[in-house]
Amino acid sequence: MTIFGESAGAMNCNILCASPMAKGLFRACISQSGAFMSSMSMVTQQQAEMLGSMFVQQLQKSSIEELRAMDAKSLTGTGVNFMACTPIIDGKVLTDEVYRLYELGQYADVPVMLMYNSDEGAVVEIETAEQYKAQMNGLPQNYVDSVLAIYPADTDEQAYYSVRDVVRDLNFGWPAYAWATLQKKTGKSAVYSAYLAQKSDRTVYAKGNRRGAAHADDIMYLNGSFLKEAERYPQEATVSEIMQQYWVNFAKTMNPNGAGLPEWPVYEEGKKTVMQFNNGATLIETPNMVGISLIDRFMQYVRKVKAEASGQ
């Protein structure tokens, strides 16, 4: 079977690829807008137990049995921060950080198709440049300077768009890049990379002032929403039809290519091997690499600090 997910579903696919418990249960993977490649996105068993204890206290319960007895509406309506619910390096489902497992080649080496969208961060809004800059509190100053050079905030309008680009590159662009490049280095199976940049006045979550496809907009293209209104959305319908054909081909054969479609080569860093969906399908180099390169250096710094702190 081919596993397939978007956003949180894509992150789940990434965990399945990295988990020794899931090896052999699927033959290919499609991941759209999500992966747990950052060292900051997972916790150890000890940290998880501490967070779990805090979670129980917030809900004013005293045992797992009491938590299990709660109905879903009561649980989700409590205002509890579920962002602490993150992958756990427990020695079973995950034996190490996902990035490290990919470095070591300890993952399901199956064909993968990875995609994210050009305006993923359009679901995030800030009002002022000061709000944007405040989010960098705690970062080393050299990284703050580099961030502001690439994602400027001289005006509120600049900051409005910069925060969206940071969200896109940090949460979606870099994880896809890290996954693709690491699997190319340590794996043997094909890696296909894609980028949805089609702009439309229809969206799933985002508000106005968008520059391309926002987070979750890819769902509309794959479920055929635009095909039902092709006269009103001709460009979107064209992209939708192309994407559907590629996705079905990959699910069937582990290769997206097929009759009547532009040839989609396997991913090669620094070459035009990323399939961009924008008024059709064309090949480009990895997009947004200036920002992604900065994030890659920062993630190296984070891994180094964590290793030194743990005595590794």
Predicted regions, residues:
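Short, solvent-exposed turn/loop segments enriched in Gly/Ser/Thr/Pro and often Arg
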Residues: 4-10, 194-202, 262-268
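C-terminal catalytic lobe of FAD-dependent flavoproteins
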Residues: 243
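Substrate-gating cap/lid region and adjacent catalytic-acid/histidine neighborhood
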Residues: 28, 66, 73-237, 246, ...
